[in-house]
Each structure stands twice: as C-alpha cells, then as structure tokens.
C-alpha cells in the first residue's frame, strides 16, 4: 500500500515515523526457486518462473522491478508451454461449476504418476471468482461456482480469462488458504513494509541536524542511507507461497502509484503526492488495503452459500486507529490522505483491469473467504468430502517461491512550502473469518444449488 507522509523537518517523533513508514520504495520480486512435479515447473499453473505483479525477488530476498524485456520473454515462454493444453472453460460461462472431489482426484492421480496436474485443473476450470459454494451430499462433494472462461496469456505473461482479461483463480492459492485458515483466526492474512527501528533512529538523528533545505536531492539520498532497507513482513500465509507474492506485489504497486513513480493509467486516480497542498501539516499518512463483503447468503438447510459485494477498500492509518478506538491524527494532510483513499477505492476495479495483480489480490481474498466458510460451517464434513489430500503438506508439496524480505529505500518527494512530502508505507490485511460471522437466509440460493447439481455430468470436474 502506498503511503506518503507530510513531515516538518523539525517535528519528527519516533512513534510518528514508525506509524507512517518513511521513504519510498523500489522493488523487484523474485523467481520461484523450487519446483514440484504435480504443480509443474515452479507452480503458477505450471507456467515456470513467476513474476507476480511484474516484480522479482533475488536470492537475498530483495525486491526489484522486472525488466520489460524479461516480462515479454516470459509471456512468450508461457504461450509455448501452454500450446495445445486445455485452458479453463470451453468459452465464456456465466456460472461455471467445479467439483472439488474431482479436482482432488486429478491431483491424486498426478501425484501417483509423478506427473503434472493439467493446467485447467490448476486454474479451477477457468473460474474468475467464486459466487457460490454448494454442498452435494449425494456425490459427497463441494461445488464451487462462478463465472468462467477459457484462458489466454496476456502481454505481461499473466494467465487471464479470454473475454474479461481477469486473472483466473489458482488451485495452489486455494490450497494455501485451506491450510492456513485456522491459523488466520488470529491476525488474518496480511503483509506490510516497515523501516527497522535502527533505521528510524538514524533518520531522526539525520533530520535533527538538517539546517538547509536547498539541495533536496542530496537530502533524499542521505535519507535513504540513514533509513536503510525496509523490512517486509508477511503473516497468516506462508511467505514462500504464491498467495504471499500477490499480497506483497499488490502492496508494492499501490505504493508506486501513490508515490507517483508510475501512473495509475486512470484519469480519476492521480498520485497522492500530487494532491498534497502547500503547508499541509506534519501528519504522516499510512495507507492500508482491506476487503469488504456483503453478508453471505444461505439457504435454510445451509447447503448453499452465496458470496457477494466483495470490494477492496483503501484506508488511512488514522481510519484504522479510529476503528480500534484510538485517537486519530489531525491536520489537513489527513483529509487529503483520506481523499486519496476514497479515489483508490472508487477506481479499484478499473485499476485491476489495467494491472492484474490487483485482481489477483481480490481472487486470493475470495479463496480465503471460501476456506473460512468451509472450515467454520464444516461443509466438507457435511458433504462427506475428505480434503486431506490437499491439506497434507508431506504428500502434496506446493511450489516454493522466493521469500520477499527487504525493499531498498528510495526517498522521493516534493517540497511543499517549508515542509517535505515524502513516501511512507502501509500494508495489505484482511480477516476472512470476519466475513463468515454474519449470514442471511435467501431462498433463491437454494434454487441455484438444485440447478447446479442437476446438471452435473458423469465425467469431468467442471460443467456449465
């Protein structure tokens, strides 16, 4: 997430600095380091080395932007790998149904043979999102349903729906969510980027000695050196998973947009930095991305569930503090930070259409909520479905990705009157368990289940 902070050089308490993670970042996300047969060469639907969100991670866990030529080469390699393979649904489907029992059978067969799971299985039959979860007691199955499509490789190497261009759901993200959901009861699923305490102290000391603002670039460079690399923290999911890569990459891309390091591509979403007025105050805004849902609808027998109203919202640090009952920050910069968050929230879906990593984040949130629903309502037990083949880490190893650990600090900002506007950090966080606490009864959800189960084919793991 992006954060920029307005700070007056004479006014920088350590706590304020910590709350609004200083200095802008330039990242480069890494490649996957370990491959497992069932999930292909390094996972990601069997597509080889990953570059989630256009970033890469080196052997030391340091993030950087991926070279555009490397992205183009990766896209071409993926097209070659997928040539002639089944990719998602056979054309656009408004309500694609996917059998988890048959998905599990396909995975077990691949593990037994030491072969790769078919790409259409790894992409959950081309699902773009999950709208329904159905319990099928007769077939001892759980059925996921939502819009589906055939898959194509886009210009940046992402596996996306042919019609909408949205990234497809990935089986490996669902497995990570199912495995991690119990531990996520405390703290949710999240990532953040923080300066070290030592770096904050060093930056404080440096700013306390600044007497002249004449050479801004020199000051920025010294700030970078004083603060040092920022630390990446991932919680609630394994840091070496694709799921974690998505959290970090979305956070990073949002920061770059807010900092003005790359355009959003949307007229209605300028950088936060460009919006801050002169003399805006000394508050240090920090931005977070969170998820919201409408109450989950269910039938009276709790055999059919409908997810709706999912959206990602941008919040300032003071919004989060207010929610916790703590004092909010004050000042004009807080109002501008809030306004930028409102614009980010308003244009999130449009941004996701331009930068797929934001759609991937929404996909991961959906799958985490599905995992929480299955666990909290014991849906697998109700169906008589054994999920252990997916949950058994010893028998089904997932791809291992480079663990993002640090971001080189790049101080970037502008002078506003006698004050500096600098970049700061934030994070991505959501609590999937919160979304399954409140449900509403809706008769039409049960009708959808009846139609879906009646059309189940004798063979195949997905159907319309």
Model regions and ranges:
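Outer membrane pore-forming secretion/assembly proteins and partners of Gram-negative envelopes
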Residues: 39-464
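Serine/proline-rich low-complexity intrinsically disordered segments, especially terminal tails, linkers
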Residues: 5, 12, 30-36
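N-terminal secretory signal peptides that target proteins for export/translocation
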Residues: 1-19
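Bacterial N-terminal signal peptides
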Residues: 19-34
